[in-house]
Amino acid sequence: MLDTSFIIDLFKNPDRVKKYFSLIDKEGACLTSISYFEIFRAKRFMSKREISYFNQLFSAYPVYTFDLEASEKASEIWIKLERLGETVSVLDVMIGGIMLANGVDKIITRDRNFQTMSKVVDIEAIIV
């Protein structure tokens, strides 16, 4: 899974993330509808080049959505984190739910919220 922060780095700082390309080639990549929302909510500030880049990227990889199964998994993550007294962005918990619902166990990200989530669910956060 490619998190929003990594997706943005692909466009803005490709040199920063190029060392992860072999992992992506080896294991594949997928995206989420949450990341699409996070990126395109700023569409009015984006150049045509950025819009085109991100549209092509989201067309090139599978995009998993926040369906009922993902909602259930996200709720479970949220409850487990609450019990530990941990707070994580609701959008990141939704991405975590999507991961679990689709059998995805790794995410490439700059966001340490996924490391926090890995305390309560079996996901690996690969921090850029």
At which residue positions do the language-model features occur?
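Histidine- and aromatic-rich ligand-binding microenvironments
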Residues: 2-3, 32, 88-89, 111, ...
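Short, hinge-like loop/turn segments at secondary-structure boundaries
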Residues: 47-50, 81-82, 124-127
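Active-site neighborhoods of divalent-metal-dependent phosphate/nucleic-acid chemistry enzymes
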Residues: 63-106, 110
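Generic structural signal for small/hydrophobic residues in well-ordered secondary structure
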Residues: 3-4, 39, 74, 99
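Short, well-structured N-terminal submotif of metal-dependent ribonuclease cores
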Residues: 1-31, 41-56
